[in-house]
Regions:
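Conserved N-terminal beta1-alpha1 strand-loop-helix module at the mouth
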Residues: 1-69
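C-terminal alpha-helical cap/extension of soluble enzyme domains
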Residues: 4-15, 203-275
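Active-site-adjacent beta->alpha loops and helix N-cap segments on the catalytic face
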Residues: 12-15, 36, 60-73, 91-100, ...
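Active-site mouth loops of central-metabolism enzymes
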Residues: 21-37, 55-60, 82-98, 121, ...
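Hydrophobic faces of well-ordered beta-strands that scaffold small-molecule active sites
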Residues: 23-29, 49-54, 79-85, 114-116, ...
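Generic structural signal for hydrophobic
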Residues: 41-45, 74, 105-106, 135, ...
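Catalytic cores of alpha/beta
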Residues: 97-102, 163-173, 219-232
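Conserved anion-binding
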Residues: 113-189
């Protein structure tokens, strides 16, 4: 879609890459919105959303027409569509033929990105890697979701093997993952703030080109921290209700005090905003 002139252009703000972006991606969770709600969200925020995620079990209880219409609407606003890993995990438990039928329907819908994970299922790593390669071969971009915990409470203690975590993420990339998504549960989600495992996030960030990693960061203090530590072009996965605040934080115009008037980007001399 053609870009419209912004209001108050006399006020400078941090530049961001134009779509299609190679970094600073925003992956937004859709919680089952209808068409009118989705269009209202896209009308105000589509420029800041790179991929809309159809999440959890929700697409299974919605009509095929609604899902198809939502995908068409996203395309109209230059937003790609991804699908969370829950349905794929259920398909895995129901056998190879269900997996085959499910992946075929994902492709037929025109869904471009699919989370591949083993959050709920117990599956050997080589099988996960084979699944990533299969999804890629079907022309779907596999987003390998990797985490340290699933279904915990804030008061539960967990053991984090960060070397194993980083190793798994690297193997997922080698198998053909488009990017790896670091699940927040056990790191910042379901943790008291004093127990955040930002040390683990830091080890992941240091082990990868940041363009290859997506960080789940639903809470404002978490994504503000990531922007402060890794810059405004870090890839982030948030709820769609966070989009406007997140984009303002990326541009240094909103957010907690560490970000205000401190955020900057640099794309070289006279090269524009694409790279």
């Amino acid at each position: 879609m053609a870009k419209e002139q912004k209001a108050f252009e006399c006020i400078r703000m941090v530049e961001r890459q134009d779509k299609p972006r190679t970094s600073g991606l925003t992956y937004a969770r859709d919680l089952g919105m209808g068409l009118r709600s989705l269009e209202a969200e896209l009308e105000s925020s589509a420029e800041f959303i790179d991929i809309l995620k159809l999440t959890s079990f929700v697409p299974r209880i919605q009509s095929k027409k609604l899902i198809s219409d939502k995908i068409k609407l996203c395309r109209k606003y230059d937003v790609e569509v991804g699908l969370g890993g829950a349905l794929l995990e259920i398909a895995l438990l129901q056998g190879p033929q269900t997996v085959k039928a499910f992946l075929g329907e994902v492709r037929d819908f025109g869904i471009t990105h699919l989370e591949v994970c083993r959050q709920a299922v117990i599956m050997p790593l080589p099988h996960l890697l084979e699944l990533i390669a299969l999804v890629k071969d079907m022309g779907i971009l596999p987003l390998a979701e990797v985490g340290v915990a699933y279904g915990i409470t804030a008061d539960e203690e967990i053991y984090v093997d960060d070397a194993k975590l980083v190793g798994t993420m690297k193997k997922c990339m080698e198998a053909g993952a488009w990017k790896v998504l670091l699940e927040s549960e056990g790191l910042t989600e379901s943790r008291h703030k004093k127990d955040y495992r930002c040390d683990v996030v830091s080890k992941v960030a240091n082990a990868f080109n940041l363009d290859d990693v997506m960080f789940e960061a639903d809470d404002r203090d978490v994504y503000t921290r990531y922007i402060t530590q890794y810059g405004p072009e870090v890839n982030l996965f948030v709820d769609y209700t966070r989009i406007t605040h997140l984009e303002c934080t990326r541009r240094g115009g909103w957010g907690k005090h560490p970000v205000i008037n401190r955020v900057a980007t640099f794309y070289g001399f006279g090269k524009g905003k694409k790279r």
